[in-house]
Amino acid sequence: IPSREKYTDLKEKFIFPGIVDMRVFVGEPGYEYKENFRTLSNAALAGGVTSVVTMPNTSPVIDNVSMVDFLKRRGRDKSKINIFPTASLTKGLEGTNMNEFGLLNKKGIIGYTDGTQTIQNTRLMSRIMRSAFDLDALVIQHAEDNELSKDGQVNDGIIATKLGLQGIPDYAEKIIIERDLTLLEDFNCRYHIAQISSEKSVEIIKNRKEIVKFTTGVSINNLSLNQNDIGDFRTFLKLSPPLRTEEDRLSLIKGINQNLIDVIVSDHKPEDEESKRLTFSQAATGASGIETLLPLALELFHNGSIKLSKIIECMTCN
Protein backbone atom coordinates (compact mmCIF):
# COMPACT_ATOMS: atom_id res chain seq x y z
CA ILE A 1 0.00 0.00 0.00
CA PRO A 2 1.66 3.27 -1.06
CA SER A 3 2.16 5.83 1.68
CA ARG A 4 -0.03 8.94 1.57
CA GLU A 5 2.52 10.98 3.45
CA LYS A 6 4.13 13.81 1.51
CA TYR A 7 7.60 15.13 2.17
CA THR A 8 9.12 18.43 1.09
CA ASP A 9 12.86 18.88 1.00
CA LEU A 10 13.58 22.12 2.90
CA LYS A 11 17.34 21.88 2.75
CA GLU A 12 18.84 25.37 2.51
CA LYS A 13 15.32 26.86 2.83
CA PHE A 14 13.77 29.08 5.49
CA ILE A 15 10.34 28.71 7.05
CA PHE A 16 9.26 32.33 7.46
CA PRO A 17 6.48 33.24 9.92
CA GLY A 18 3.42 34.98 8.50
CA ILE A 19 4.23 38.67 8.10
CA VAL A 20 2.34 41.33 10.04
CA ASP A 21 2.14 44.57 8.05
CA MET A 22 1.39 47.47 10.39
CA ARG A 23 0.58 50.13 7.79
CA VAL A 24 -1.92 49.23 5.09
CA PHE A 25 -4.52 51.41 3.37
CA VAL A 26 -7.51 49.51 2.04
CA GLY A 27 -9.94 51.28 -0.30
CA GLU A 28 -13.03 49.84 1.31
CA PRO A 29 -15.31 51.67 1.97
CA GLY A 30 -15.36 54.49 -0.54
CA TYR A 31 -12.36 53.74 -2.74
CA GLU A 32 -13.04 50.21 -3.89
CA TYR A 33 -11.81 51.09 -7.38
CA LYS A 34 -8.33 51.32 -5.84
CA GLU A 35 -8.48 48.30 -3.52
CA ASN A 36 -10.99 46.10 -1.72
CA PHE A 37 -10.60 43.38 0.88
CA ARG A 38 -10.54 40.61 -1.70
CA THR A 39 -7.78 42.15 -3.82
CA LEU A 40 -5.88 43.21 -0.70
CA SER A 41 -5.87 39.72 0.77
CA ASN A 42 -4.80 38.14 -2.54
CA ALA A 43 -1.89 40.57 -2.84
CA ALA A 44 -0.97 40.09 0.82
CA LEU A 45 -0.86 36.30 0.61
CA ALA A 46 1.21 36.49 -2.57
CA GLY A 47 3.75 38.45 -0.52
CA GLY A 48 3.68 36.24 2.57
CA VAL A 49 1.60 38.69 4.62
CA THR A 50 -1.03 37.03 6.81
CA SER A 51 -2.09 39.95 9.03
CA VAL A 52 -2.53 43.66 8.33
CA VAL A 53 -3.23 46.75 10.40
CA THR A 54 -5.54 48.95 8.33
CA MET A 55 -5.60 52.74 8.40
CA PRO A 56 -8.87 54.68 8.90
CA ASN A 57 -8.50 56.85 5.78
CA THR A 58 -11.63 55.62 4.03
CA SER A 59 -14.89 57.26 3.00
CA PRO A 60 -16.64 57.41 5.41
CA VAL A 61 -13.75 57.59 7.88
CA ILE A 62 -13.38 54.79 10.43
CA ASP A 63 -14.20 57.01 13.41
CA ASN A 64 -17.27 55.46 15.04
CA VAL A 65 -18.64 52.15 16.26
CA SER A 66 -20.87 51.48 13.24
CA MET A 67 -17.99 51.96 10.81
CA VAL A 68 -15.79 49.65 12.87
CA ASP A 69 -18.52 47.01 12.79
CA PHE A 70 -18.81 47.41 9.02
CA LEU A 71 -15.07 47.13 8.48
CA LYS A 72 -14.70 44.05 10.66
CA ARG A 73 -17.67 42.38 8.99
CA ARG A 74 -16.35 43.07 5.49
CA GLY A 75 -12.92 41.89 6.49
CA ARG A 76 -14.33 38.70 7.93
CA ASP A 77 -16.53 37.99 4.90
CA LYS A 78 -14.21 39.01 2.06
CA SER A 79 -10.65 38.67 3.32
CA LYS A 80 -8.42 35.59 3.54
CA ILE A 81 -6.06 37.27 6.03
CA ASN A 82 -6.32 38.72 9.53
CA ILE A 83 -7.59 42.30 9.56
CA PHE A 84 -6.73 44.49 12.56
CA PRO A 85 -8.41 47.89 12.13
CA THR A 86 -7.36 51.21 13.58
CA ALA A 87 -9.74 54.10 14.13
CA SER A 88 -9.02 57.77 13.68
CA LEU A 89 -7.51 59.89 16.45
CA THR A 90 -9.85 62.74 15.53
CA LYS A 91 -13.37 62.87 14.16
CA GLY A 92 -13.37 62.84 10.39
CA LEU A 93 -9.56 63.01 10.34
CA GLU A 94 -9.99 66.77 10.74
CA GLY A 95 -7.44 67.16 13.54
CA THR A 96 -9.89 69.11 15.70
CA ASN A 97 -12.07 66.93 17.93
CA MET A 98 -10.62 63.91 19.72
CA ASN A 99 -12.31 60.59 19.04
CA GLU A 100 -14.14 58.46 21.62
CA PHE A 101 -11.42 55.98 22.55
CA GLY A 102 -13.41 54.32 25.32
CA LEU A 103 -16.28 53.22 23.08
CA LEU A 104 -14.01 52.11 20.26
CA ASN A 105 -11.72 50.13 22.57
CA LYS A 106 -14.67 47.87 23.36
CA LYS A 107 -14.95 47.06 19.65
CA GLY A 108 -11.44 45.66 19.48
CA ILE A 109 -9.68 48.62 17.88
CA ILE A 110 -5.95 48.03 18.28
CA GLY A 111 -4.82 51.62 17.89
CA TYR A 112 -5.68 55.15 16.84
CA THR A 113 -4.17 57.19 14.05
CA ASP A 114 -5.11 59.84 11.54
CA GLY A 115 -3.22 57.81 8.96
CA THR A 116 -1.67 60.19 6.45
CA GLN A 117 -2.62 63.18 8.60
CA THR A 118 -0.59 64.53 11.53
CA ILE A 119 -1.97 65.95 14.77
CA GLN A 120 -0.64 69.49 14.42
CA ASN A 121 -2.18 71.11 17.49
CA THR A 122 0.04 70.53 20.54
CA ARG A 123 -2.74 71.06 23.05
CA LEU A 124 -4.93 68.51 21.26
CA MET A 125 -2.03 66.05 21.16
CA SER A 126 -1.52 66.40 24.90
CA ARG A 127 -5.23 65.66 25.48
CA ILE A 128 -5.02 62.64 23.19
CA MET A 129 -2.01 61.28 25.06
CA ARG A 130 -3.64 61.80 28.46
CA SER A 131 -6.80 59.98 27.34
CA ALA A 132 -4.77 57.23 25.68
CA PHE A 133 -2.85 56.65 28.90
CA ASP A 134 -6.06 56.44 30.94
CA LEU A 135 -7.61 53.95 28.49
CA ASP A 136 -4.43 52.04 27.54
CA ALA A 137 -4.91 53.04 23.89
CA LEU A 138 -2.13 53.00 21.31
CA VAL A 139 -1.44 56.31 19.54
CA ILE A 140 0.11 56.04 16.07
CA GLN A 141 1.45 59.28 14.63
CA HIS A 142 2.42 60.18 11.07
CA ALA A 143 5.18 62.69 11.84
CA GLU A 144 5.14 65.67 9.49
CA ASP A 145 4.72 69.38 10.15
CA ASN A 146 2.06 70.56 7.71
CA GLU A 147 3.35 74.10 7.32
CA LEU A 148 6.87 72.95 6.52
CA SER A 149 5.73 70.24 4.12
CA LYS A 150 2.96 72.28 2.44
CA ASP A 151 2.86 71.66 -1.32
CA GLY A 152 5.96 69.46 -0.98
CA GLN A 153 6.48 66.71 -3.54
CA VAL A 154 9.94 65.21 -2.92
CA ASN A 155 12.79 65.45 -0.45
CA ASP A 156 14.10 68.98 -0.08
CA GLY A 157 17.49 69.13 -1.76
CA ILE A 158 19.27 68.60 -5.04
CA ILE A 159 16.58 66.38 -6.61
CA ALA A 160 13.83 68.88 -5.80
CA THR A 161 15.92 71.62 -7.39
CA LYS A 162 16.75 69.50 -10.45
CA LEU A 163 13.11 68.57 -11.05
CA GLY A 164 11.77 72.00 -10.18
CA LEU A 165 9.53 70.62 -7.42
CA GLN A 166 8.69 71.90 -3.96
CA GLY A 167 10.75 70.04 -1.35
CA ILE A 168 9.80 68.47 1.99
CA PRO A 169 12.60 69.11 4.52
CA ASP A 170 13.67 66.38 6.91
CA TYR A 171 13.15 68.72 9.86
CA ALA A 172 9.40 68.72 9.13
CA GLU A 173 9.51 65.16 10.47
CA LYS A 174 12.02 65.93 13.21
CA ILE A 175 9.95 68.74 14.76
CA ILE A 176 6.85 66.58 15.26
CA ILE A 177 8.86 63.69 16.70
CA GLU A 178 10.64 65.96 19.16
CA ARG A 179 7.37 67.57 20.22
CA ASP A 180 5.57 64.27 20.73
CA LEU A 181 8.42 62.66 22.66
CA THR A 182 8.57 65.70 24.92
CA LEU A 183 4.85 65.34 25.64
CA LEU A 184 5.33 61.62 26.15
CA GLU A 185 7.64 62.29 29.09
CA ASP A 186 4.61 63.65 30.98
CA PHE A 187 1.79 61.48 29.64
CA ASN A 188 3.55 58.12 29.12
CA CYS A 189 0.92 56.60 26.86
CA ARG A 190 1.55 53.83 24.34
CA TYR A 191 3.01 55.68 21.36
CA HIS A 192 4.24 54.57 17.95
CA ILE A 193 5.86 56.69 15.23
CA ALA A 194 4.34 55.28 12.05
CA GLN A 195 7.45 55.65 9.90
CA ILE A 196 10.59 57.73 9.83
CA SER A 197 12.71 58.65 6.84
CA SER A 198 15.79 60.61 7.88
CA GLU A 199 19.09 60.46 9.69
CA LYS A 200 17.93 63.31 11.93
CA SER A 201 14.97 61.26 13.12
CA VAL A 202 17.20 58.27 13.86
CA GLU A 203 19.41 60.50 16.02
CA ILE A 204 16.42 61.81 17.98
CA ILE A 205 15.21 58.28 18.63
CA LYS A 206 18.68 57.19 19.71
CA ASN A 207 18.82 60.04 22.23
CA ARG A 208 15.31 59.48 23.61
CA LYS A 209 14.98 55.68 23.75
CA GLU A 210 16.38 55.55 27.28
CA ILE A 211 14.18 58.41 28.50
CA VAL A 212 10.69 57.48 27.27
CA LYS A 213 9.08 54.28 26.04
CA PHE A 214 7.87 54.26 22.44
CA THR A 215 8.23 52.33 19.20
CA THR A 216 9.12 53.32 15.66
CA GLY A 217 8.38 52.06 12.17
CA VAL A 218 10.01 52.49 8.78
CA SER A 219 8.75 51.83 5.27
CA ILE A 220 10.54 49.23 3.18
CA ASN A 221 10.61 51.93 0.47
CA ASN A 222 12.85 54.17 2.56
CA LEU A 223 15.10 51.22 3.44
CA SER A 224 15.50 50.09 -0.16
CA LEU A 225 15.37 53.24 -2.28
CA ASN A 226 16.61 56.82 -2.23
CA GLN A 227 15.62 60.08 -3.91
CA ASN A 228 17.73 59.33 -7.00
CA ASP A 229 15.36 56.48 -7.87
CA ILE A 230 12.67 59.04 -8.70
CA GLY A 231 14.65 59.74 -11.87
CA ASP A 232 12.69 61.83 -14.34
CA PHE A 233 9.39 62.23 -12.51
CA ARG A 234 8.55 58.59 -11.69
CA THR A 235 5.20 59.22 -10.04
CA PHE A 236 4.95 55.70 -8.62
CA LEU A 237 7.73 56.77 -6.25
CA LYS A 238 5.86 59.82 -5.00
CA LEU A 239 5.57 58.75 -1.38
CA SER A 240 4.96 60.09 2.11
CA PRO A 241 7.38 60.41 3.77
CA PRO A 242 9.42 61.02 0.62
CA LEU A 243 12.45 59.05 -0.43
CA ARG A 244 15.47 60.91 0.92
CA THR A 245 19.25 60.78 0.45
CA GLU A 246 21.44 57.68 0.38
CA GLU A 247 22.90 58.85 3.70
CA ASP A 248 19.41 58.86 5.18
CA ARG A 249 18.72 55.37 3.82
CA LEU A 250 21.91 53.97 5.31
CA SER A 251 21.11 55.65 8.62
CA LEU A 252 17.71 53.93 8.68
CA ILE A 253 19.37 50.56 8.10
CA LYS A 254 21.75 51.35 10.94
CA GLY A 255 18.73 52.22 13.08
CA ILE A 256 17.27 48.77 12.41
CA ASN A 257 20.52 47.04 13.31
CA GLN A 258 20.94 49.07 16.50
CA ASN A 259 17.39 48.24 17.70
CA LEU A 260 16.28 51.85 17.37
CA ILE A 261 13.61 51.06 14.77
CA ASP A 262 11.15 48.33 15.72
CA VAL A 263 8.91 47.68 12.72
CA ILE A 264 9.27 47.43 8.94
CA VAL A 265 6.06 48.15 7.00
CA SER A 266 4.99 48.24 3.37
CA ASP A 267 3.02 51.51 3.62
CA HIS A 268 0.72 49.85 1.09
CA LYS A 269 -1.44 52.62 -0.42
CA PRO A 270 -2.56 51.65 -3.92
CA GLU A 271 -3.70 54.33 -6.33
CA ASP A 272 -5.60 53.92 -9.56
CA GLU A 273 -3.72 54.37 -12.83
CA GLU A 274 -5.46 57.65 -13.65
CA SER A 275 -4.23 59.18 -10.37
CA LYS A 276 -0.63 58.32 -11.21
CA ARG A 277 -0.60 59.16 -14.94
CA LEU A 278 -0.39 62.87 -14.19
CA THR A 279 2.39 65.38 -13.73
CA PHE A 280 4.41 64.70 -10.60
CA SER A 281 2.89 67.59 -8.67
CA GLN A 282 -0.63 66.49 -9.59
CA ALA A 283 -0.15 62.74 -9.10
CA ALA A 284 -1.52 61.04 -6.00
CA THR A 285 0.87 60.11 -3.21
CA GLY A 286 1.31 56.43 -2.41
CA ALA A 287 2.09 53.08 -4.00
CA SER A 288 1.19 49.40 -3.78
CA GLY A 289 3.75 47.60 -1.68
CA ILE A 290 2.36 44.63 0.19
CA GLU A 291 3.49 42.09 -2.44
CA THR A 292 7.02 43.47 -2.60
CA LEU A 293 7.58 43.95 1.14
CA LEU A 294 9.20 40.54 1.65
CA PRO A 295 11.26 40.45 -1.59
CA LEU A 296 12.72 43.89 -0.86
CA ALA A 297 13.43 42.92 2.74
CA LEU A 298 15.18 39.74 1.62
CA GLU A 299 17.29 41.79 -0.78
CA LEU A 300 18.53 43.74 2.26
CA PHE A 301 19.51 40.40 3.78
CA HIS A 302 21.24 39.12 0.66
CA ASN A 303 23.30 42.28 0.24
CA GLY A 304 24.41 42.11 3.86
CA SER A 305 22.54 45.17 5.11
CA ILE A 306 20.32 43.48 7.72
CA LYS A 307 20.45 40.03 9.32
CA LEU A 308 17.59 37.69 8.49
CA SER A 309 16.72 37.25 12.17
CA LYS A 310 16.31 41.03 12.50
CA ILE A 311 14.09 41.20 9.41
CA ILE A 312 11.88 38.44 10.81
CA GLU A 313 11.68 40.24 14.15
CA CYS A 314 10.72 43.58 12.57
CA MET A 315 8.08 42.04 10.28
CA THR A 316 6.43 39.44 12.50
CA CYS A 317 6.83 40.46 16.16
CA ASN A 318 4.71 43.60 16.08
What are these regions (language model features)?
Residues Y33-A43, L93-L104, R179:
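Short, acidic/polar
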